[in-house]
Amino acid sequence: MDSNTVSSFQVDCFLWHVRKRFADQELGDAPFLDRLRRDQKSLRGRGSTLGLDIRTATREGKHIVERILEEESDEALKMTIASVPAPRYLTEMTLEEMSRDWLMLIPKQKVTGSLCIRMDQAIMDKDIILKANFSVIFNRLEALILLRAFTDEGAIVGEISPLPSLPGHTEEDVKNAIGVLIGGLEWNDNTVRVSETLQRFTWRSSDENGRSPLPPKQKRKMERTIEPEV
């Protein structure tokens, strides 16, 4: 096993532990707590894949971080922080909407890249909106935290989430996954639309008027343009 892979996992485990202690003191905001839960699932998946114990990895990660901090001057730390662009975290869903459990009468699931798509194909003739929490950097979608499909009544009927065991996905991965989800839901005559915020950062405007590059019908309600793959 590559030593960099192991040490990276160890450092991630320790940094998660520090963030958890911070959250235990009720100091974290909603995006912070959301990332904490997502990263916990990711670490469990990576630990299982690598065959490493998380507690042991956390202790080793602490030693690595302490060694780095001993060698790091305050001035070097300031320069490092200043040179790293900070992503923005955009929330279209409340904490309750993100953490709510939901059931599927006719469950369908598909994995595309490192994203898992789930939907209830028992849903028919509904108006559905896709909302997501995600991070943005340089005006581009950086990472999807969670996307869910809601009916007008507020019921959850589908979602796209990163697989904990396969970290990392691209903007194209997200667009492809959204296309699959829309195709599956529209197969049962549901009308699906994507939130304006998600459209703006996933399908960035490319014309001189700043309009979304989606065709008019697709922009309005993301008409059925993709055959269902789920």
From Swiss-Prot:
GO terms for biological process: symbiont-mediated suppression of host cytoplasmic pattern recognition receptor signaling pathway via inhibition of RIG-I activity; symbiont-mediated suppression of host gene expression; symbiont-mediated suppression of host mRNA processing; symbiont-mediated suppression of host PKR/eIFalpha signaling; symbiont-mediated suppression of host type I interferon-mediated signaling pathway. Upon interferon induction, ISGylated via host HERC5; this results in the impairment of NS1 interaction with RNA targets due to its inability to form homodimers and to interact with host EIF2AK2/PKR. Residues 204-230 are annotated as: Disordered. A motif (Nuclear export signal) lies at residues 137-146. Coiled coil: none annotated. Keywords: Eukaryotic host gene expression shutoff by virus, Host cytoplasm, Host gene expression shutoff by virus, Host mRNA suppression by virus, Host nucleus, Host-virus interaction, Inhibition of host innate immune response by virus, Inhibition of host interferon signaling pathway by virus, Inhibition of host PKR by virus, Inhibition of host pre-mRNA processing by virus, Inhibition of host RIG-I by virus, Inhibition of host RLR pathway by virus, Interferon antiviral system evasion, RNA-binding, Ubl conjugation, Viral immunoevasion. A motif (Nuclear localization signal) lies at residues 34-38. Residues 180-215 are annotated as: CPSF4-binding. One of its GO terms (molecular function) is RNA binding. Residues 1-73 are annotated as: RNA-binding and homodimerization. GO terms for cellular component: host cell cytoplasm; host cell nucleus. Residues 223-230 are annotated as: PABPN1-binding. Inhibits post-transcriptional processing of cellular pre-mRNA, by binding and inhibiting two cellular proteins that are required for the 3'-end processing of cellular pre-mRNAs: the 30 kDa cleavage and polyadenylation specificity factor/CPSF4 and the poly(A)-binding protein 2/PABPN1. In turn, unprocessed 3' end pre-mRNAs accumulate in the host nucleus and are no longer exported to the cytoplasm. Cellular protein synthesis is thereby shut off very early after virus infection. Belongs to the influenza A viruses NS1 family. The dsRNA-binding region is required for suppression of RNA silencing. Homodimer. Interacts with host TRIM25 (via coiled coil); this interaction specifically inhibits TRIM25 multimerization and TRIM25-mediated RIGI CARD ubiquitination. Interacts with human EIF2AK2/PKR, CPSF4, IVNS1ABP and PABPN1. This is Non-structural protein 1. The gene is NS.
